[in-house]
């Protein structure tokens, strides 16, 4: 009898068993009744076989104490919840530490006391036969779990100089599983880490899981309606502040993208056969097909003329036009792919990434920071080459713009969405977009390509086009759109090279931070919300799938281009804007040029970016019955992530009102650094789009269409799949809650934080939430007031003790300013130019009541 894996599942309720909440689902599976021996002999078994259906009851862990979650690893591995182990190992850092997991696991299944940091070997006792200790099957399960942990997350054990967790694991295995393959692998990893130079070991451990301040079990109150015998859990890490990471230098210096030391590869041993849920198996098999080794290619021979050495031995700096567009795109793709493959996926978790600006957390996620730096470097290169040479006339500058458009098209053909987005962001930045004379000289064909490429990141229908492309092409061999250059398609087919895909990582960062913001860490008081971790796992799985796809690229580095790119001068926002104004004074700049060429697809309503208006939308796997979640569009939309990515600069030329509000330049005129990546990430509430710091322009800015990328994630190495889950919505009150965005009232920038407001929250409560997110711990709520931005000229002050949910203007944008109580009555609230996400249309999105 065979069970069909393709089955329908319906959630019917929950069960509480021993301090663990299980989601109960009914799964309808098809049973293929085998034919009789006679039928098989006659060859007619297929005709006579009966198709029967059976309904199975399935339980999956939804929430539990830390002790129970760790304890469930073994039974889950043995078959009751096939994806549980994978999700746990991927996300546990959000609610506990490696040391705690080992202590609880060994205490429960090793019958030993928790080891100290010095890893005392003598305290680990072999399995007790008196208690009917685990059989071989149980030992195999524990061995497989620990082996998977070592193989896939070896960095968890890199804790120089003593490596306490790894030594604890070695001691446990040595006494309970002597002579096993796991013991050999653990000893090998320990030897490798100990052999590293101290500096190398420290660099390997740059991004450990955040050490959480954990309360002892005795201090924790029992969960509501639950009476677990022992509650072992961690203090939830909620609403971490996410400030932008400085990426671009403030002065024109040579600063190549940082090269990061790769995490040491675990020993190449057979991986434990962790079973995955049926719905995840196709994705796994798909990802395995992507693991083909890249075909080595000979070094590229320059097909263009390079400057020759002069009499004094110096060479003239090569010009962009000397590098063919396909070569530039290939080199960008090579750089982007290498950095993306080095990204540690779980560092993208909202609870980790959004803490990077906190004191003591500067070491977090260096691989992600490297991708941010590369994105900014590409965008800066575009702006510098367009503005750096003041001797160029408009027609010559137009040729440079056309060259970059061609590079962008080649990036599209290579499925490099990261550099594609960086180039488009730079071309639509304030400093370049305003150059009327230059754009007039751009050929109509090039401009048409520019429009077509920009449509990829359009915010229409929640960035549906970019999501569809990612789903369609994420693991395909070639790009499929008609904009793919014919020669590129021909070259691909002739060489037979299979391409990878480099996504815009801001998409995932936004989604994960918003997921972290929208869903509770704990349910019923002290039970860890494991359903939230499953949804995060879906996103991280997509990252892993695309990382494996990047192995399909086969591009050789070109030394001359790499040297030229790394030596590119960096322009600050003020410098680029000044150069732009020198080329075409403000009175001559006109965004009408693009409009005259029907560039309606570039970016809608740039002027909207001047006022905070970002929308929080999202969707992950549907959890229809939960009252604790909100239904949203696919993916998360600007939340805490755009908090981190949403930096606004007080603009450079307040008189230049006709300019489109875009400037993805490295830093604002007042010296506050700002990033192309982060401004780009903001513009798309959920995957980041090309938002920009406004150069203090007025709301009369010309309208265009913001570009922003997005995408869809699915975990377990499943291919970019759906996910229509539940998260909060911005700019919409449904039921008794809503999401608002709160920024600080400052002159040199704004950082927005997403705040959940319920019908019970009064002004002091909301102010305290906003202060916590903005790290204003030393101040008191009484020192601040909450002001809603209705329009450019209209602000609404929320009364001191008013219920914010009912006092706010629900028809306007849910954008607020947290303002110090120092202004006189009647005075206008400051409003600096901002580079926020464009407001997204809410279509068919509803919030379930009582989400939190």
From Swiss-Prot:
GO biological process, one term: small GTPase-mediated signal transduction
Domain (Ras-associating): residue spans on this chain: 736-823
Cysteine disulfide links: none
PTM notes: Phosphorylation of Tyr-752 by MET blocks HRAS binding.
Biased composition (Low complexity): 613-624, 683-710
Pfam families found in the cross-reference section: RA, RasGEF, RasGEF_N
Subcellular location: Cytoplasm; Nucleus
Function: Functions as a guanine nucleotide exchange factor (GEF) activating either RalA or RalB GTPases and plays an important role in intracellular transport. Interacts and acts as an effector molecule for R-Ras, H-Ras, K-Ras, and Rap. During bacterial clearance, recognizes 'Lys-33'-linked polyubiquitinated TRAF3 and subsequently mediates assembly of the exocyst complex.
Subunit structure and binding partners: Interacts with RIT1 and RIT2. Interacts with OOG1. Interacts with TRAF3. Interacts with HRAS.
Domain comment (free text): The Ras-associating domain interacts with Ras.
Protein name (Swiss-Prot/TrEMBL): Ral guanine nucleotide dissociation stimulator
Species assigned in the record: Mus musculus (Mouse)
């Amino acid at each position: 009898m065979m069970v069909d894996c393709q089955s329908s599942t319906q959630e019917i309720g929950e069960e509480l068993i021993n301090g663990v909440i299980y989601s109960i689902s009914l799964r309808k599976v098809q049973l293929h009744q085998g034919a009789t021996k006679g039928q098989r002999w006659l060859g007619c078994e297929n005709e006579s076989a009966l198709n029967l259906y059976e309904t199975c009851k399935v339980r999956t862990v939804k929430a539990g104490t830390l002790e129970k979650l760790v304890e469930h690893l073994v039974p889950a591995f043995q078959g009751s919840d096939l994806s549980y182990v994978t999700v746990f190992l991927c996300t546990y850092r959000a609610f506990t530490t490696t040391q705690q997991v080992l202590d609880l696991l060994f205490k429960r299944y090793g019958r030993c006391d928790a080891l100290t940091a010095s890893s005392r070997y003598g305290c680990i006792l072999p399995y007790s036969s008196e208690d009917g200790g685990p059989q071989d099957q149980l030992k195999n399960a524990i061995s497989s779990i620990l082996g998977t942990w070592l193989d896939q997350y070896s960095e968890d054990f890199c804790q120089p100089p003593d490596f306490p967790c790894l030594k604890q694991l070695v001691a446990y295995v040595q006494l309970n599983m002597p002579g096993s393959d796991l013991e050999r692998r653990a000893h090998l990893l320990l030897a490798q880490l100990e052999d590293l130079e101290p500096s190398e070991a420290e660099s390997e451990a740059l991004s450990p899981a955040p050490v959480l301040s954990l309360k002892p079990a005795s201090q924790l109150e029992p969960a509501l309606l639950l009476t677990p015998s022992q509650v072992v859990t961690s203090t939830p890490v909620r609403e971490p502040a996410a400030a932008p990471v400085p990426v671009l230098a403030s002065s024109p210096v040579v600063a190549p993208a940082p090269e990061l030391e790769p995490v040491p590869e675990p020993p190449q041993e057979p991986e434990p056969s962790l079973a995955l849920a049926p719905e995840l198996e196709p994705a796994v098999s798909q990802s395995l097909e992507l693991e083909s080794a890249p075909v080595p290619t000979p070094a590229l021979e320059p097909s263009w003329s390079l400057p020759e050495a002069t009499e004094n031995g110096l060479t003239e700096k090569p010009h962009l036009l000397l590098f063919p567009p396909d070569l530039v795109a290939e080199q960008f793709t090579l750089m982007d792919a290498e950095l993306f493959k080095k990204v540690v996926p779980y560092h993208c978790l909202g609870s980790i990434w959004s803490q990077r600006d906190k004191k003591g957390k500067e070491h977090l996620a260096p691989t992600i920071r490297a991708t941010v730096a590369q994105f900014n470097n590409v965008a800066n290169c575009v702006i510098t080459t367009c503005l750096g040479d003041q001797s160029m006339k408009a027609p010559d500058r137009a040729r440079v713009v056309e060259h970059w458009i061609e590079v962008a098209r080649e990036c599209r053909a290579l499925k490099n969405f990261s550099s594609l987005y960086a180039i488009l962001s730079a071309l639509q930045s304030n400093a370049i977009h305003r150059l009327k004379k230059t754009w007039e000289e751009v050929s109509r064909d090039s401009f048409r390509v520019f429009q077509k490429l920009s449509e990829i990141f359009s915010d229409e229908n929640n960035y549906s086009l970019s999501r569809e492309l990612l789903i369609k092409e994420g693991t395909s061999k070639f790009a499929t759109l008609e904009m793919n250059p014919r020669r590129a398609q021909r070259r691909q087919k002739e060489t037979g090279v299979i391409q990878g895909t480099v996504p815009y990582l801001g998409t995932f960062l936004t989604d994960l931070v918003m997921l972290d913001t929208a869903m509770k860490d704990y349910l019923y008081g002290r039970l860890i919300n494991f359903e939230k971790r499953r949804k995060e796992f879906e996103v991280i799985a997509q990252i892993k799938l695309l990382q494996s796809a990047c192995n399909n690229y086969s591009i050789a580095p070109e030394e001359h281009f790499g040297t030229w790119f790394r030596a590119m001068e960096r322009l600050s926002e003020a410098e680029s804007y000044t150069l732009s104004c020198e080329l075409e004074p403000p009175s001559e700049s006109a965004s009408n040029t693009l409009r005259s060429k029907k560039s309606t697809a570039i970016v809608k309503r740039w002027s909207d970016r001047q006022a905070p208006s970002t929308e929080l939308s999202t969707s992950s796997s549907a959890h229809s019955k939960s009252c604790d979640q909100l239904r949203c569009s696919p993916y998360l939309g600007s939340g805490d992530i755009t908090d981190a990515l949403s930096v606004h600069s007080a603009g450079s030329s307040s008189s230049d009102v006709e300019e489109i509000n875009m400037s993805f330049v490295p830093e604002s005129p007042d010296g506050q650094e700002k990033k192309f990546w982060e401004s780009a990430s903001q513009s798309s509430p959920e995957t980041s789009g090309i938002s920009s710091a406004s150069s203090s322009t007025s709301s009369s800015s010309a309208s265009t269409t913001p570009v922003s990328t997005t995408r869809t994630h699915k975990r377990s190495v499943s291919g970019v799949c759906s996910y229509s889950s539940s998260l909060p919505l911005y700019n919409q009150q449904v039921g008794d809650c809503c999401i608002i965005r709160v920024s600080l009232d400052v002159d040199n920038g704004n950082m927005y934080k997403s705040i959940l407001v319920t019908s019970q929250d009064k002004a002091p409560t909301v102010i305290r939430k906003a202060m916590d997110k903005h790290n204003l711990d030393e101040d008191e709520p009484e020192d601040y007031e909450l002001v809603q931005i209705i329009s450019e000229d209209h602000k609404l002050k929320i009364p001191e003790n008013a219920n914010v949910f009912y006092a706010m203007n629900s028809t306007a944008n849910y954008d607020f300013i947290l303002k110090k109580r120092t202004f006189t009555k009647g005075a206008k609230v400051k409003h600096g130019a901002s580079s926020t996400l464009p407001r997204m249309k809410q279509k068919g999105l509803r919030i379930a009541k009582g989400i939190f």
